[in-house]
Amino acid sequence: MKKVLIMSSVHPWNDTRVFHKEAVSLARLGYDVTLYAVASNHVYEGNIPNLRVVTFAPKSIAQRWKTWLQLYKIAKRSNAEIIHIHDPELLPLAYLLKRKHRKKVIFDMHEDFPAVLKGKKIGKMRMPKWLLRVVATTEKKMLQKMNAVIYAEKYYKENYESLTTKQMDIYNYPFLQEPTDILKYEKQTLIYAGAIHEIRGFKEMLAVAKLLKKANNDFQLLIIGKVPQRLEIYAEQFIQKHDLEDEVKLLGRLDLHELMTYYAKSHIGLAILHPEANYLRSLPTKIFEYMSVSLPYVLSNFESYGRLVEETKSGYVVDPLSPNEIASQIQVLLDNPSTQAELGANGYKQHVANFNWSVEERKLGELYDGI
């Protein structure tokens, strides 16, 4: 049985892609898998054959180097046939493992790294172009040494056309879901799950809740994910000021199985991301999760999102920076349960036909078999 070592210094051990999809799939395909990742508010019960999980406490950015060193020492001593690395900050580690220790290494790209860098700041200044070029050149040289590079989005590889190493697209599609008969919440329920940040529409969602309450709607907004302290304070003040205690619920981070139940019981999914470079062409996983439980949704009006909505007829797009427009489109859905049902059914058909993990699992197995 081939041994696989999976490592992340950023993601919690029960991350949907890292654990539930890739690690579990590899164990099911017959690999002996060990995952090193960040501890979360859930504990692995050790109930999956061939899969071991080792966690470490999350560290601040300033202290993250200690985790990198720890993972490097573990990996270089490991007898795993394949090492699967998940974070850009661990790419130098992956490069050293390949060049210095002759390990077989896969790098898994979750985001459009060049676009992310363009949005970063040093103090109050954007990263200078010369530094972006240096980082991009260095990144490509390191990626070229990998045994394989995995892309979570099809367009990512447009930045790496010069690479000749093995490459494969493995998308974040949800597990194939059976039609659900779970009862919906009595209140019309809006739901968002994922990273919580200003640029992911957190403040706009609260503003929308205020507008919907002002229009006398009986609803609730569930926001699932770890809320940074600054936004937790903002939310508490906003909720109290506008008397939204009965409407807005911040539920913290949930495990995937719990999350899917919340989705299934809700009425409308939200993905109101701001027009940041890393988001414009990258379809959020949550859209496909919404489809898998027949949940209609409201998305940002980016070109790639608009194409998906046009092709699938399963949701609506709006200006993500306009709470009034977002609230108006949600109001249309709240007032028309039959439209909710029609859009949800369209999305589920697409989930079964095109957007589920089964195909991606086969691709992952083929990639591993070829290394």
PLM features: residue spans?
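A short, well-ordered alpha-helix in the C-terminal region of glycosyltransferases
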Residues: E325, V332, T339-N354, K363-E366
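Donor nucleotide-sugar binding/catalytic pocket of nucleotide-sugar-dependent glycosyltransferases
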Residues: R52-V54, K129, V135-P179
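N-terminal strand-loop element at the rim of the active site
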Residues: I6-H20, V24-R64, K73-S78, Y155-E161, ...
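Conserved acidic donor-binding segment of nucleotide-sugar-dependent glycosyltransferases
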Residues: E311-T312, Y316-P323, V332-S338
